[in-house]
Amino acid sequence: MTNPLTPIGALNRILTAVQVVNLPQLNVTAGFFGVRAATISPEGEASDYIPTMTGAAPSPRPYQMYSIRFWLNKSQALAQAWENQRQQNTTIGDINVVTDSPVLGPYYFINCTFLNVEEINLDGTSNDYPVMLRGTYPVNAALFA
């Protein structure tokens, strides 16, 4: 039987950050987020499962695509800096996303680009400026061993 008194831990929302390796002027820390902070979502499979006559053969991929979304406080200049970057060059490069968990390591994404801009509310009831990126996340490192 498991211990019912296992410590649950705590999240720290001000840990969340987006660090842009080659464009540090775009780095985002807690004070620059709007109401929401950030999300990361895998797209597609980390491994293919290829049918055979009598079963299936796994075929691990060396990378997985991810969507990275975060919401900036649009009343701060950093939101305009991200908009300027989108207008100038949609290629961002590598980014590091620090999570809200003190025990979960950061996620490092390669070759990130802008996906799109979600709806921006302009009626004075939301301060969120949405940023959507797509990047490559290395998985299955054992393939290279």
Model-inferred region functions:
Residues A77-E83, A142:
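Short, conserved charged micro-motifs
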Residues N73-S75, D100, C112, T136:
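Short, loop-centered acidic/histidine patches that primarily coordinate divalent metals
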Residues R134-A141:
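Hydrophobic lipid-interacting interfaces of membrane-associated proteins
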Residues A81-Y108:
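Short, acidic/charged, Gly/Pro-enriched secondary-structure junctions
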Residues T2-K74, G105-P106, T113-S126, P130:
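Solvent-exposed edge beta-strands and adjacent loop segments
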